[in-house]
Amino acid sequence: VTPAQRAGLSVGFATGLYGISFGALAVASGLDAWQAVALSALMFTGGSQFAFIGVVGGGGSPAAATGAATLLGVRNTVYGLRLATLVPPRSAPERAAMAQLTIDESTAVAVAQQDRAEQRRGFWAAGLGVYVFWVAFSALGAVADDRIGELDALGLDGAAVAAFTGLLWPHLSARRPVVIAVLAAVVTLALVPAVPAGLPILGAAVVAAAAGWASRPETLRSTS
């Protein structure tokens, strides 16, 4: 096992643990266990999944939930462009698999490696590690939800916010992400009393996407 593979598997397990919260909260939001697991297996991007169930659980429409999840998942397209040069797919099936596994963690582990072979190993170890553990722990959380009882009685009604913050926190190491996060939070709070459930988080996603697009030229210059 190479250093990149060890790093990828460690990241996979640590990230996968959040799946327990997702599974339990998905069921509490109105999904059944199979739907929760399917969402993890098919959508497979934590931020988008928590946004989806947050909107659904708050009474928002499926369209608003899907819109919020989609906007939060746009960043994976940018990752894909970067990884296409670092870890180019060798076949059509591999390209499809890499598209599914292109997330924050697999990209971070791949980019952190200096050796080209290690970049590929790191990507696959992190991508597959997160996928397996995320889906497995999502299933565990969905099944365990029936045994947990009322979420508010255990103080778990804020678990979605805490889990989402946990996913976001590692990305707030620079000034720009912090400013964007604060601005998105302000927009969300301002919209809560004024618009139907589900739309505030969609508004925050629009703000984040617009800010990312506005900073795109500078980002491209810094990575070239």
Identify the role of each PLM range.
Residues 1-4, 117-118, 216-224:
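Intrinsically disordered, low-complexity non-transmembrane regions of multi-pass membrane transporters
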Residues 2-18, 31-37, 42-45, 152-173, ...:
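Helical membrane-embedded segments and adjacent short helical loop/helix-boundary regions
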Residues 6-99, 117:
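Pore-lining transmembrane helices
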Residues 28-29, 86-90, 147-152, 194, ...:
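Membrane-interface elements of multi-pass transporters and channels
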Residues 44-48, 71-78, 162-168, 188-190, ...:
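Alpha-helical transmembrane segments and their membrane-interface exit regions
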Residues 66-157:
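Helix-loop-helix junctions within the multi-pass membrane cores of secondary transporters/permeases
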Residues 118-203, 210:
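Membrane-embedded alpha-helical modules
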